[in-house]
Amino acid sequence: FSSDSPLAIYQIQNKFRMELRAKSGILRGREFIMKDMYSFHTSTEDFEKFYEKMKEVYKTIFGRVGIGHLTYLTFASGGTFSKYSHEFQTITSLGEDTIYLDEATGTALNKEVLNEEVLKQLNLTKEKLVERKSIEVGNIFDLKTKYSEPFELSFTDEKEQKHPVLMGCY
């Protein structure tokens, strides 16, 4: 495996969710088309480089479809996968999410994680933030070894030592 790092695998397929009601227009109906991608890495440095590249890939995609100027990389809850994640949130009056935006820096955070600890981590002050309605159009997050350890997905380094693979989700 280590000679293949980074390895990225994706799928595009119909997804079905038992949503109580449709949300965010056609983006969160009960059936929708979704792309999932997972990356596998042998070092933190390799993972971080790939993660940053994927941020830029998504920004490029949103720009090409005409929503780049309205879409912000947003610090958010990681849900069941990680403590925090990055969402791509598009500003719209029809949005059901609330983000707080520092317009001077373009830094955004989801309302669900707005607290003093996060503000300090992002070097933001609450007074400089403006509230905006938005729709989540994508997210990426660091899985670390959450799944590789329980499934014993590992690689052997040049010293013949086994290590769990680092994973990302996009």
What are these regions (language model features)?
Residues 1-170:
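TRNA-recognition modules of translation machinery and tRNA-sensing kinases, especially anticodon-binding
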